[in-house]
Amino acid sequence: MDACRAMVAVAKHHGMSVTVHRAIDRACNIMAALEDIISLGADRVLSSGGQRTSYEGLETLAKMNEVAAGRIIIMPGGGVNAGNIKEILTVSGAGEIHFSGSDTIQSDMVYREGVSFTPEILGGDFTRSESSVEKIMQTIQATR
């Protein structure tokens, strides 16, 4: 914790904002981890509420926002799209949100023999994520 606290202090000294990424979603006790992150002085925490997607973790995200009580920004992220963004923002009480608005694209890679290093469930070695302006615009529009 001391090393993390020092890192946050250095970032703040240089005028940077500090966001703790989704590591909190792996914590045994998310609310205790949230208190630890608040004590570090971070500005926000990106979370899916301990679930695969923020929609699935919506109840926990709302509770995190309640527990945080304005001491830190709870930023839902993970699986956010045009079909669920409004509900995620409303139910969680979040004022900020994170989403990729991406499509999975087949790689142009031709050589495909040998061992795959990425499980097929994650798209395999021969796909990549690419931001989609259309998906981003649809998701933003869905908040209005």
Each model region followed by its residue ranges:
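Hydrophobic pocket-lining residues that define ligand/cofactor binding sites across diverse proteins
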Residues: 11, 37, 143
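Glycine/small-residue-rich loop that forms an oxyanion/phosphate-binding "nest" at active or ligand-binding sites
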Residues: 1-10
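Glycine-rich phosphate-binding active-site loops on the catalytic face of alpha/beta enzymes
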Residues: 42-55, 92-113
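Catalytic cores of alpha/beta
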Residues: 2-3, 25-40, 64-74, 80-99, ...
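Alpha-helix N-cap and loop-to-helix initiation/capping positions
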Residues: 2-3, 29-32, 52, 56-59, ...
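C-terminal helical cap(s) of enzyme catalytic domains, especially alpha/beta-barrels
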Residues: 58-67, 87-92, 106-144
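Catalytic beta/alpha-barrel core
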Residues: 1-2, 17-27, 43-55, 75-77
